Regions:
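Mid-chain, well-packed structural core segment of small domains
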Residues: 48-80
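N-terminal intrinsically disordered, cationic/polar leader segments
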Residues: 24-26, 38-50, 55
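Beta-strand elements of well-folded, non-transmembrane domains
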Residues: 18, 46, 65-67, 95-99
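C-terminal charged interaction modules
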Residues: 77-104
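Extended intrinsically disordered, low-complexity coil regions enriched in Ser, Thr, Gly, Ala
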Residues: 16-37, 69-81
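Short, structured motif recognition centered on aromatic/hydrophobic residues
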Residues: 3-5, 10-14, 59-63
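Residue-level detector of beta-strand structural context in well-folded domains
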Residues: 1-3, 50
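One face of beta-strands
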Residues: 10, 30, 48-50, 55-59, ...
Length: 104
């Protein structure tokens, strides 16, 4: 998983195995640590609606399951999903099919 912060946007890039894990209800985690301190942490999961929350422990991004499920059978494709979180902030989700993949 790669998370890129841009002006008014968060870009999330997953490989196919990570995307499949989201569809199965698993939570993806990414943390950057220095010594014992968490400098950056994010959790991404699927749920009933789009939510972005943050706190001392990091961010949690919940992506709408229905939109993920509708997107899955259209892969591979060049464009990703875009979500408007409000206040001009966008979430872009892309699935990199050149990386690892799972079958089944």
């Amino acid at each position: 998983m790669k998370v890129q912060l841009q002006h008014r946007a968060i870009r999330v890039r997953l490989d196919r195995a990570e995307f499949d894990s989201l569809l199965r209800g698993l939570t993806l985690r990414l943390a950057l640590r220095h010594s014992d301190d968490a400098l950056f942490a994010v959790e991404i999961c699927a749920g009933p609606r789009l939510e972005l929350t943050g706190g001392a422990e990091g961010w949690r991004l919940q992506l709408p399951t229905g939109e993920l499920e509708a997107y899955a059978p259209t892969l591979p494709r060049r464009d990703g999903l875009h979500f408007d979180i409000g206040d001009g902030l966008g979430i872009d989700l892309e699935v990199d099919l050149r990386g690892k993949s799972t079958t089944g």
